[in-house]
Each structure stands twice: as structure tokens, then as C-alpha cells.
From Swiss-Prot:
Function: Part of a membrane-bound complex that couples electron transfer with translocation of ions across the membrane. Required to maintain the reduced state of SoxR.
Protein name, per record: Ion-translocating oxidoreductase complex subunit D
PANTHER family: ELECTRON TRANSPORT COMPLEX PROTEIN RNFD (PTHR30578), ION-TRANSLOCATING OXIDOREDUCTASE COMPLEX SUBUNIT D (PTHR30578:SF0)
Pfam families: NQR2_RnfD_RnfE
ATP-binding keyword on record: no
Disulfide bridge positions per record: none
Length: 352
């Protein structure tokens, strides 16, 4: 009898990286569809720009490194990076912004570290943060959902705004951002933070058109529920583990509830946190990145909980309305430490 000697791991996941990435791309369809419905064609244009930029940037670096271009591009990781960045930025952001952010994400945040599996930080979130810090006005210029918008740009106007900055009739972002109350609109999280700092009461803030949704912000609640649906499908397909999304959402909900109970005049209610911004996108599609997240089950719970706490702290007390990207990157920093203290004990090895 022949005994085969091999190093660990002794159990293997038969799914290839490309298939897992493809499952994540498919799971993003509900979220993309919801953003298209409420915010127009811009999301689709940004996805196309980001996808092409990601593939070209990755191909260029692979060519310079004398590595197989076709084999690496087939893993779909570049496409996923581009998609996650594209759905995170305003749909009418200038074309060069998504190109710049995607190229930075792929070349600097991913390939500079050695490529897929070597990068310590989520590339899409690195690209997003670079854009947010460099171009804060453009990165916070979201359109109002169509249900409260005065001007809804068509496909041609969308293309013209993205590539030239104005519509065929001469309209610009200022006119497109007007809501039914005649006031330029922002996201629910941005509106809440700005209004509280301006001295408005929570009761007044909740009367704004942006909060006319059944559960939370108009449009944004359905976008988050769509990303949640995609995330649940990923769990059902066993493409991701449940530990990170659950601990993230539970921690965020717990912190938001406690904060709201103790300070209802200054802090947002839990449903605003859970169903606004990039909450569900972050929980199921960004934090669960297998390369930059913790690799142990206990570590995943800690990692998700830490990210949830950071999101609430940044949203409630920080300078930015949504803290998902910063929370992800800060949590990424702690992964080596978390994995070190949560690694499974070797069989037969005693504690201490």
C-alpha cells in the first residue's frame, strides 16, 4: 500500500476563484437594478467605465510583470473590484473619477502588493477613499431618488453629464439634485448629519422628503434591501460565510439602538443606519472579501463586529456621513492580529 505524504490543508474547496467571483457578480444584480431604478442610468455607465478600466489596468501591469494576462483576467477579480467601486460612487460623477479610482485600486492597492491574494486592503475601498479625500464635493453629489426628484435625466443626458458636466439643455448637477421641495438633496445619512449640526431637531429632519420611505430614506431603503437579497443568495450558495455579515449588522444595530435611546435628539435611529448608505453592500459584498478579512470563524465574528462599531462611530461622530469604506480599511489593518489570537489550537497541543 502506498501512503501519500502531503502538506496541509487536507480538505479542499473545489470551487475555483473565478467561479466564486462570478457568483458575487451575479449576486450584485439586484442591488445594481435597484440603483438603476432609483438613480438612473449613471450607475450602469459607471460600471462599464470601471470594468474596462480595471481590465486594462490589470492587463498592463501583468504585461509589465511578464505574467499571463489571459489566465489572470479570467479570475474575474478585476471586474469585481471595478463593479464595487462603481456602485459606491455617485452615478453622475465625472468619467475620469471612476477611471482614476479604478486604476489606483487595481495597480496600487492590488498589483503593487503582488496581485490577488497578497493585498492587505480591499482595493475597491482604497480607490473609493482616495476619490473621497481628493474630490469630496463630487463624491457626495448623489442624485435624489426618482420619487422625490424634480429633474430625472434620461440616458442621453446622463452620458452628457458624465462626460461634459451638463445636459443638452444646459442643466448641471445643481439642477439635477433638486428635490420636490426645491432644495438640493443629499443622501439620508449626509442630510441627517448636516441638519443636526445646523441645529435642526430630529422631528424636523424626519419631515424632509428624503425620509419619506416606509422604513428609512426614500429609495435607499430599497437599494439596501436589494443588496441584502443578493447577500442572502451568496450565503445560500455558500460563496461567503455568515459570521462577518451577522456580527457586523448586529453590532451596528446594537450601537445605533443604544445611541438613539440615550441621545434621540442627535443620533439617528437604527433603521436609518441599517437601510441607508452602503450598509448591506458593505456587510455582504465588501467585508466578506476572503483576501482581506479574517480567516478564522472567531476572527470573522470579531472582524465584523469591529467594522460595525467603526461604521457607527464614524457616522455618528466623524466628519464623513457614511463610514463603511473607512471602517473596512481600519478593520483590514487588524486582521493579522485577529488571526494570530484566534487561530485554532493544533490537535494535541495544550493551552499555555
Amino acid at each position: 500500500m502506498v501512503f501519500r505524504i502531503a502538506s496541509s490543508p487536507y480538505t479542499h474547496n473545489q470551487r475555483q476563484t473565478s467561479r466564486i467571483m462570478l457568483l458575487v457578480l451575479l449576486a450584485a444584480v439586484p442591488g445594481i437594478a435597484a440603483q438603476l431604478w432609483f438613480f438612473g442610468w449613471g450607475t450602469l455607465v459607471q460600471i462599464l467605465l470601471a470594468s474596462v478600466s480595471a481590465l486594462l489596468a490589470e492587463a498592463l501591469v501583468l504585461k509589465l510583470r511578464k505574467q499571463s494576462v489571459a489566465a489572470t483576467l479570467k479570475d474575474n477579480s478585476a471586474l469585481l473590484t471595478g463593479l464595487l467601486l462603481a456602485v459606491s460612487i455617485p452615478p453622475l460623477a465625472p468619467w475620469w473619477m471612476v477611471v482614476l479610482g479604478t486604476v489606483f485600486a487595481v495597480i496600487i492597492a492590488k498589483q503593487l502588493y503582488g496581485g490577488l491574494g497578497q493585498n492587505p486592503f480591499n482595493p475597491a475601498m482604497i480607490g473609493y477613499v482616495v476619490l473621497l479625500i481628493s474630490f469630496p464635493v463630487q463624491m457626495t453629489s448623489w442624485l435624489p431618488p426618482h420619487e422625490i426628484a424634480v429633474n430625472i435625466p434620461g440616458f442621453i443626458d446622463t452620458i452628457q453629464v458624465i462626460f461634459s458636466g451638463h445636459t443638452a439643455s444646459g442643466g448641471d448637477m445643481n439642477t439635477l439634485r433638486l428635490g420636490i421641495d426645491g432644495i438640493s438633496q443629499a443622501t439620508p445619512l449626509d442630510t441627517f448629519k448636516t441638519s443636526v449640526r445646523a441645529g435642526h431637531s430630529v422631528e424636523e429632519i424626519m419631515q424632509y422628503p428624503i425620509y419619506s420611505g416606509i422604513l428609512a430614506g426614500a429609495g435607499w431603503q430599497w437599494v439596501n434591501l436589494a443588496w441584502l437579497a443578493g447577500g442572502v443568495w451568496l450565503l445560500w450558495q455558500k460563496a461567503i460565510r455568515w459570521h462577518i455579515p451577522l456580527s457586523f449588522l448586529v453590532t451596528l444595530a446594537l450601537c445605533a439602538t443604544l445611541g438613539w435611546l440615550f441621545s434621540p435628539d442627535t443620533l439617528a435611529a437604527p433603521q436609518i443606519h441599517l437601510l441607508s448608505g452602503a450598509t448591506m453592500l458593505g456587510a455582504f459584498f465588501i467585508l466578506t472579501d476572503p483576501v482581506t478579512a479574517s480567516t478564522t470563524n472567531r476572527g470573522r465574528l470579531i472582524f465584523g463586529a469591529l467594522a460595525g462599531l467603526l461604521v457607527w462611530l464614524i457616522r455618528s461622530f466623524g466628519g464623513y456621513p457614511d463610514g463603511v469604506a473607512f471602517a473596512v480599511l481600519l478593520a483590514n489593518i487588524t486582521v493579522p492580529l485577529i488571526d494570530y489570537y484566534t487561530r485554532p489550537r493544533v490537535y494535541g497541543h495544550r493551552k499555555g
